[in-house]
């Protein structure tokens, strides 16, 4: 059975037509919960049962409190939020702490909260219906992970935020029928030092990273999608990627809001 992914947001920042990272799988699963979630209707928000987080930076988690506030009272079960220890701990300590936001992991009651938090480990596979979601290792400025989403018909890989990472590609190369790879590139080549220190990629680094992808793991129609472009440099970043990829087999494309991917 195939799976559909709808891109609610994939930018490294905001503007009138840009939203931060939020990917909707089959109407009921979110990967990250950035500002793109705010474009969903109340009925669409109520359908979301699971959120899988890549890390705790604000542009990836900011809509979780608002989902609970908007539709928690009209749902009959908690919103299940998954993440590695550092991500879940950050939510508990810094968001749902009754200072920044009410603790919806205990509201309206500890036994029946609007939100439940669930720990996962890198390498761990979580089954949601017919979909298997595996946390992948990455290298960011804080503890983080990517995801491989296996529908049975194909696999989509999402890097989340990462810099150069051999471990990520080793894990990707263990997947099957990889049809889509969504990977970040946040900075221009002239800002490569900043990209590295902040745990991100530049165009040159991206092209080198893609050389680590083993074709044996890939679907014949593999597509590479670039996300997390900084708003004031996105077009220039894609231009650099296009030039660097002229002689490469893989031709990365810009991921846009409202794109739908099937796998």
Label for each model-derived stretch:
Residues 1-44, 144-161:
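Conserved beta-strand hairpin/beta-sheet module of binuclear metal-dependent hydrolase folds
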Residues 87-144, 152, 246-262:
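Metallo-beta-lactamase
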Residues 10-11, 28, 33-35, 56, ...:
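Active-site metal-binding loops of divalent metal-dependent hydrolases
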Residues 29, 50, 131, 154-156, ...:
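Structural motif
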Residues 40-45, 126-129, 169-174, 211, ...:
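Short amphipathic alpha-helix with an adjacent loop that forms part of the alpha/beta core around
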Residues 165-258:
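Cap/insert and terminal regions of metallo-dependent hydrolase folds
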Residues 37-83, 178-179:
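Active-site metal-binding motif and surrounding structural segment of the metallo-beta-lactamase
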Residues 74-77, 107-113, 216-222:
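Short helix-terminating capping/connector loops at secondary-structure junctions
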């Amino acid at each position: 059975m195939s799976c559909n992914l709808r891109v609610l947001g994939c930018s490294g920042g905001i503007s009138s037509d840009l939203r931060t990272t939020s990917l909707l799988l089959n109407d009921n699963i979110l990967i990250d919960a950035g500002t793109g979630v705010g474009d969903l209707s109340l009925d669409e928000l109520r359908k979301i049962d699971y959120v899988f987080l890549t890390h705790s930076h604000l542009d990836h988690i900011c809509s979780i409190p608002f989902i609970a506030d908007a539709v928690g009272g009209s749902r009959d079960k908690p919103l299940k939020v998954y993440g590695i220890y550092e991500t879940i701990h950050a939510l508990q300590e810094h968001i749902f702490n009754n200072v920044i936001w009410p603790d919806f992991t205990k509201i309206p009651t500890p036994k029946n909260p609007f939100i439940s938090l669930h720990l996962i480990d890198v390498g761990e596979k979580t089954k949601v219906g017919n979909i298997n979601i595996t946390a992948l290792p990455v290298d960011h400025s804080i503890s983080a992970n990517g995801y491989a989403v296996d529908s049975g018909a194909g696999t989509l890989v999402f890097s989340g935020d990462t810099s150069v990472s051999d471990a990520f590609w080793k894990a990707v190369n263990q997947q099957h029928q990889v049809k889509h790879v969504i990977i970040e590139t946040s900075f221009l080549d002239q800002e490569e030092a900043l990209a590295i220190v902040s745990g991100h990629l530049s165009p040159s680094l991206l092209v080198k990273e893609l050389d680590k992808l083993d074709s044996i793991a890939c679907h014949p129609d593999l597509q590479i999608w670039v996300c997390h472009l900084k708003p004031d440099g996105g077009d220039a970043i894609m231009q650099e990627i296009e030039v660097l990829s002229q002689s490469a087999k893989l031709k990365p494309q810009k991921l846009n809001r409202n794109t739908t991917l099937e796998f």
